[in-house]
């Protein structure tokens, strides 16, 4: 979409014209995809400061919408967007070492995850509230390292572990959670419950 503005008074501008460069009309065929697109925009809206352009985050959002438009697994695509947005904006959790003591986890082993502390925590430092399997850790790190979106669903356990870890990060570090923003947009929000 191209929008052309002319300056107005204060922060307001006058919209002169808009043209659509690219549409994602296939998303409209799936309520799940529509919901994921809305949730993705809530993630970005929450994490990106107002009036601060973030072209790399915009590019990830466009790739996300393209993936949904082309039939990517909806839940996995949304999790990928969340992981990448966190990484690009400097909020990615520490997954390669204990956030307290720096100890590296054993390769191929699960790790305790503590969103409040910002990553994995070894047993000696008290562990974390969640367990991320070796597969979920590998997948998370791989998602951060690539621009691709999945073409196939992930194993249920890995998807759920990553979903839970992201939800805990959101609850501990966002001023308004993605769940709350999505509910607010649908008229069901009743305020923060924590």
Which residue ranges define each predicted feature?
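Non-catalytic alpha-helical scaffolds and adjoining flexible linkers that form interface surfaces
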Residues: 1-194
């Amino acid at each position: 979409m191209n929008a052309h503005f002319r300056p107005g008074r204060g922060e307001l501008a006058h919209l002169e014209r808009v043209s659509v460069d690219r549409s994602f009309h296939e998303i409209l065929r799936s309520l799940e995809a529509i919901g994921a697109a809305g949730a993705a925009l809530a993630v970005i809206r929450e994490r990106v400061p107002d009036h601060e352009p973030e072209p790399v985050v915009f590019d990830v959002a466009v790739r996300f919408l393209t993936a949904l438009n082309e039939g990517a697994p909806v839940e996995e695509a949304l999790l990928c967007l969340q992981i990448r947005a966190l990484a690009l904006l400097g909020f990615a959790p520490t997954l390669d070492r204990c956030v307290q003591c720096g100890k590296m986890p054993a390769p191929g082993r699960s790790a305790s995850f503590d969103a409040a502390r910002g990553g994995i925590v070894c047993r000696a430092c008290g562990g974390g509230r969640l367990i991320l399997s070796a597969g979920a850790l590998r997948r998370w790190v791989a998602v951060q390292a690539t621009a691709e979106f999945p073409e196939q669903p992930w194993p249920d356990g890995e998807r759920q572990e990553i979903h839970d870890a992201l939800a805990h990060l959101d609850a501990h570090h966002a001023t308004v959670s993605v769940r709350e923003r999505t509910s607010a947009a649908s008229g069901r929000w009743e305020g923060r419950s924590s």
